[in-house]
Amino acid sequence: MKDLRQLASACEAELRAIGIRPGRVAVWKVNSRAKSRWGQCRELSPGCFEISIAARLLQDDTSDQAAKDTIVHELLHTVKGCGGHRGKWAALAAQVNAALPQYTIKRTASAEEKGLTPDPPAGRYLLRCSECGREFPRERQSRLVQHPERYRCGVCGGRLKRVR
């Protein structure tokens, strides 16, 4: 497994080299339970942050760059005024992408973009379009799950069928 602190230090140095001053990160965590996000930045107290990174990004068979993209993404959230993904955060992400071409900082990234195999669709229930084959995983037994015949595929208009 890659050393998160070493990667984070390298990322912070690269940001500082292009004039971006990230906030103070008090806690770096490896999140082994993360399934639907690559990283998370939480403000513990004003100006003090906790960043967690998905364990999948730190595995030996994953590229360093995949992890560093996420680390830089989260470090940008520590800059004052960069809580969301618009405005100042988006401008800083564009600055990083222009100054450091090895980075691709954006709001979201798929497993394929990170060089990982995607997880199979999660969910206790699975519906499938009879026309295009698109799958709709669901965790809750919603009306859609209970009565798929009342609904249509949003892509092609085909009928939905509950698979599991």
Go through each PLM region and give its residues.
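Active-site-proximal or metal-binding-adjacent scaffold patches in catalytic folds
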Residues: 1-69, 78-164
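Walker B catalytic acidic pair
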Residues: 74
